[in-house]
């Protein structure tokens, strides 16, 4: 997971636009990534929530994740972060399926 705050002075719309139309395109080029999703905080319902959104990047292993970020595509992706976010809190989690359709 990557939990993000928009860049200081950037509108929420510009943040959302950059993430979806620039950063997500770069992210989808990561080698061995199986799934990617972007989730935005509903500002109408949670105007004071401390973050603006989070992403989920799915890999088969932590080794695949590390290799992806060390790749040229990963380095390009990381270099784009300051263009739209001031804070990113990365979390590595392992999914435990409790109920799955």
For each feature predicted by the language model, list its residue ranges.
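Macromolecular interaction modules
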Residues: 1-101
